[in-house]
Amino acid sequence: MHNQAPIQRRKSKRIYVGNVPIGDGAPIAVQSMTNTRTTDVAATVNQIKALERVGADIVRVSVPTMDAAEAFKLIKQQVNVPLVADIHFDYRIALKVAEYGVDCLRINPGNIGNEERIRMVVDCARDKNIPIRIGVNAGSLEKDLQEKYGEPTPQALLESAMRHVDHLDRLNFDQFKVSVKASDVFLAVESYRLLAKQIDQPLHLGITEAGGARSGAVKSAIGLGLLLSEGIGDTLRVSLAADPVEEIKVGFDILKSLRIRSRGINFIACPTCSRQEFDVIGTVNALEQRLEDIITPMDVSIIGCVVNGPGEALVSTLGVTGGNKKSGLYEDGVRKDRLDNNDMIDQLEARIRAKASMLDEARRIDVQQVEAK
């Protein structure tokens, strides 16, 4: 219901990771990475499926050994979401997972080896139509760049990225995306800004090693939010020392906050004060858990009193404004009903689910009408 944010996205080339389009105006893809041992096939498959359920577009899997590469083959056969193989140090592992149907190869230029080894990986990727992510990281810059700059700087990350972009260009390979990650927000943001001016390849965003669930989410929201608000970024990962499922949730929350891409419910809730007429915090927490399965984009405002409640409800798909014993329910800005404050959670859950079903049906009909023309 709110006005769409006027963000003009940076123009970039289109590549595909499996069936997921990246760049050239495609929806910004949200991805995560497994933290199981890849050789534990069952645990890794279960985690990937959990990530799929919360909306992951792409999942990255670390493949540190040949044994992990063999496990990757079995994992790939059991999941639907596109998989990126994360390769460090041994280029031969990249060649092996390419045989097993990997959807994208992530290589780190600082440790994958010499130009000949990179050429072998690129030739294999070209033959099998596999895109590559050049993953530059402030913590693993090439030794000569560490010596040249003394410490990670935006210029150092840019030079590392461009060195390998130029190498891929010389090999006539353009199916790649690039990241220049750092754990420092300002270093990462400025590095991406510089890179965005130099190339038109898709950019994968991330604040690497951001921290735990709370601090990492804050760092990522600031860093990725700055870049996304400037139109920079085609895919992202929120790196958290937490359950990877939380990375997907935070990633979508960032996109929802900027009104770039919505999945599920955007809850608008007051921090509460003595004026609240019902338990706002308990209601929001309960509904967030109960309604995780809803993927329909909706704005739901839950405000405990009449100070700001009616105003928020006017621009929400559904809105509740606290009142004495009963609270006003608004739908699409129009007051419809009153809900008993003592049964708020169950009543509101039912109304939200009904509204989601109605919106889904309306979209289905719209799609059918468009396809019929």
Swiss-Prot record:
GO MF terms held by the record: 4 iron, 4 sulfur cluster binding; 4-hydroxy-3-methylbut-2-en-1-yl diphosphate synthase activity (ferredoxin); 4-hydroxy-3-methylbut-2-enyl-diphosphate synthase activity (flavodoxin); iron ion binding
Provide the residue positions that the database annotates as binding [4Fe-4S] cluster: C270, C273, C305, E312
Would the keyword Iron turn up in this protein's UniProt record? Answer: yes
Q: Per the UniProt record, which EC number(s) apply here? A: 1.17.7.3
Q: How is the cofactor bound?
A: Binds 1 [4Fe-4S] cluster.
Does this UniProt record's set of keywords contain Isomerase?
Answer: no
Mind telling me which InterPro entries this protein's record contains? Dihydropteroate_synth-like_sf (IPR011005), IspG_bac (IPR016425), IspG_bac-typ (IPR004588), NO2/SO3_Rdtase_4Fe4S_sf (IPR045854)
Group of enzyme by EC: oxidoreductase
Q: Which reaction does it catalyse?
A: (2E)-4-hydroxy-3-methylbut-2-enyl diphosphate + oxidized [flavodoxin] + H2O + 2 H(+) = 2-C-methyl-D-erythritol 2,4-cyclic diphosphate + reduced [flavodoxin]
Q: In which pathway does it act?
A: Isoprenoid biosynthesis; isopentenyl diphosphate biosynthesis via DXP pathway; isopentenyl diphosphate from 1-deoxy-D-xylulose 5-phosphate: step 5/6
Obligatory cofactor(s): [4Fe-4S] cluster
Q: Which GO terms describe its biological process?
A: isopentenyl diphosphate biosynthetic process, methylerythritol 4-phosphate pathway; terpenoid biosynthetic process
Q: Which UniProt keywords apply?
A: 4Fe-4S, Iron, Iron-sulfur, Isoprene biosynthesis, Metal-binding, Oxidoreductase
| Organism domain of life | Bacteria
Please explain the role this protein plays, according to its UniProt record: Converts 2C-methyl-D-erythritol 2,4-cyclodiphosphate (ME-2,4cPP) into 1-hydroxy-2-methyl-2-(E)-butenyl 4-diphosphate.
The UniProt entry, under PANTHER family, shows: 4-HYDROXY-3-METHYLBUT-2-EN-1-YL DIPHOSPHATE SYNTHASE, 4-HYDROXY-3-METHYLBUT-2-EN-1-YL DIPHOSPHATE SYNTHASE (FERREDOXIN), CHLOROPLASTIC
Q: Which family does it belong to?
A: Belongs to the IspG family.
Q: Which NCBIfam families match?
A: ispG_gcpE, PRK00366.1
Q: What is this protein called?
A: 4-hydroxy-3-methylbut-2-en-1-yl diphosphate synthase (flavodoxin)
The protein's organism comes out as Klebsiella pneumoniae subsp. pneumoniae (strain ATCC 700721 / MGH 78578)
Protein's gene: ispG
